[in-house]
Amino acid sequence: FLNHSDFVFLIKINFMELSNIEPQIIWKNFSKLNAVPRPSKKEEKVIAFIKEFGENLGLETTVDEVGNVIIKKPATAGMENRKPIVMQSHLDMVCQKNNDVNFDFETQGIQMEVDGDWVKAKGTTLGADNGLGVATIMSILESSDIPHPDLEALFTIDEETGMTGALGLKPGQLTGQILLNLDTEEDDEIDIGCAGGIDVTVSQNYSIEASNGQIVRIEVKGLQGGHSGMDIHKGFGNANIILGRILYK
């Protein structure tokens, strides 16, 4: 794991790159978050980071048995009778790197850079899904000038590979009457519904036959890429489908 000096140094590098982007408080918190390793199913470091963040603010902070972190912030003056709100984001990120990059997602923080109008990571995934949602909630929790009702910040784990954090929630952990999920693509849109998802397990009997053929390595790369949920209808090349077609022929 990063020692303290490495952690602080990486935050400084990241924040220097992002220091002129508004709102600065969100990008500051995103820089801090991205200095902490947070792969799915191995979120121990980021759980400890968020727990310490809430405790340092003097807010009621708990970690449930599966690893979700809940931070509660009382309503500001005059907002006590409004419906309490739950703000939710997930702590884990998709961990992918370029083939020519030597990077360990379990021990290293993400290095960010500004490229024109874009914030990018150097050779790895950025972690904006759902790091920007987490950073936004952190910024609201530490703000002193935003009127709000009672707030409950819910940081779930393992969204990318199983939803075990959300599935592990138990009745009574939250009291909020409105849930805001901060895991959408546009910051000026509010989604009021979701199609949901389905997991399918397919099995088939097969037998292995001996072969004296030559082994060939096939690599499919250079495709457009994209999110399997948001871009599935756009007809982009899919490496799995392309390889399947090659094997079929």
Predicted segments with their positions:
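Midchain, well-structured core segments that form catalytic/ion-binding scaffolds
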Residues: 37, 109-111, 115-120, 124, ...
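Short alpha-helical patches at coil-to-helix transitions and adjacent helical residues
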Residues: 47, 130-134, 240
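Buried hydrophobic packing segments
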Residues: 50, 54, 134-141, 169, ...
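Active-site metal-coordination/substrate-binding segment of hydrolases
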Residues: 79-155, 159-161, 166-168, 176-177, ...
